[in-house]
């Protein structure tokens, strides 16, 4: 799964630490998500979606090269 978290965070004027605090996670978690090293839980994805006022599928999407449907 890929994501646009880094781009959207910057557009919102947030630092990684700010976003982490707002979501109740560590900065390291945000770094891992932004670098596609960690897929967030559904709960965390929903919190991020609500915070950014976007649908989850506007933030996260399948990497079609890796995920054959």
Residue map of PLM features:
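Short, basic-rich loop-to-helix N-cap that marks the start of a DNA-contacting helix
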Residues: 37-47, 66
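Short, conserved catalytic or interaction motifs in soluble domains
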Residues: 35, 54, 64
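Key DNA-contact positions within bacterial/archaeal DNA-binding proteins
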Residues: 17, 28, 57
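Short, charged recognition helix plus adjacent turn
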Residues: 60-69
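Recognition helix of helix-turn-helix/homeodomain-like DNA-binding domains
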Residues: 25-38
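Short basic helix-loop element that most often maps to the first helix and adjoining turn
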Residues: 3-22
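DNA major-groove recognition helix of helix-turn-helix/homeodomain DNA-binding modules
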Residues: 43-58
């Amino acid at each position: 799964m890929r994501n646009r978290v880094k781009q959207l965070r910057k557009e919102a004027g947030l630092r990684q630490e700010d976003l982490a605090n707002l979501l109740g996670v560590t900065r390291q978690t945000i770094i891992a998500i932004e670098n596609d090293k960690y897929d967030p839980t559904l709960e965390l994805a929903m919190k991020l979606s609500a915070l950014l006022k976007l649908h989850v599928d506007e933030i996260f999407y399948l990497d079609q090269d890796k995920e054959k449907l």
